[in-house]
Amino acid sequence: MEIRDNNKVNLCFAFDNLRKELSRPYGILFTNNKVFLDFVSKSIQQGFKVITVGDYVSRVLEENGIIPFLEVIDGKTKRSIPQHRAIVKNKEYRVTNEAGKIRFEIFEIIENILKDRDGGVVFVNGEEDLLVIPVILSANNGDIVIYGQPNAGAVVIIVNEMIKWRVRDILEKAVVEEC
């Protein structure tokens, strides 16, 4: 997807009609931190990038010496509890994103970060949950995308063409509207 002159674009994908579909885990649900951390460590040893969406999963990894290539965070867990500030990285980006939506401009920002060899942190003013979608679409096959499943554990998605197809299918069902 290419968006030209994205500074002038004030459009979002809205997902109100897809809440039920988006509420289920789309990868491997880990409820045991040791098993989760072992899995992530092995993925890194194989040369794949680890990308996190959410403050809690980012913090758990950092506390265990695993620094994600890209972190997408909003400073909260469950929309209200203040969380950690990510380990400072060379590249930090600030974006605004409303709950239940994805701003068009965020697709390009995430794609550019994932192409960069240094990674970075995206700080979201608003809600970061749905940003798993542009992350998956921009990640390389084999990369690991991790997000938190409230009151359940961490969901790990191993990016491949099938998951990208599923995410594109969800994106096609979203409604485009002004942000």
UniProtKB/Swiss-Prot annotation:
Its pathway?
Cofactor biosynthesis; coenzyme A biosynthesis
Q: Keywords in UniProt for this one?
A: Coenzyme A biosynthesis, GTP-binding, Kinase, Nucleotide-binding, Transferase
- Pfam families in alphabetical order: DUF359 (PF04019)
Q: Which GO terms describe its biological process?
A: coenzyme A biosynthetic process
Catalysed reaction, written as an equation: 3'-dephospho-CoA + GTP = GDP + CoA + H(+)
Q: What is its EC number?
A: 2.7.1.237
Report a single Gene Ontology molecular function: kinase activity
What positions does the entry give for GTP binding?
Answer: D55, V57, D74, K76, E128
Which InterPro entries does the record associate with it?
A: GTP-dep_dephospho-CoA_kin
Keyword Transferase in record = yes
Please give the superkingdom of this protein's source: Archaea
The entry sums up its family as follows: Belongs to the GTP-dependent DPCK family.
Give the protein's biological function: Catalyzes the GTP-dependent phosphorylation of the 3'-hydroxyl group of dephosphocoenzyme A to form coenzyme A (CoA).
This one is known as GTP-dependent dephospho-CoA kinase
| Source organism per UniProt | Saccharolobus islandicus (strain M.14.25 / Kamchatka #1) (Sulfolobus islandicus)
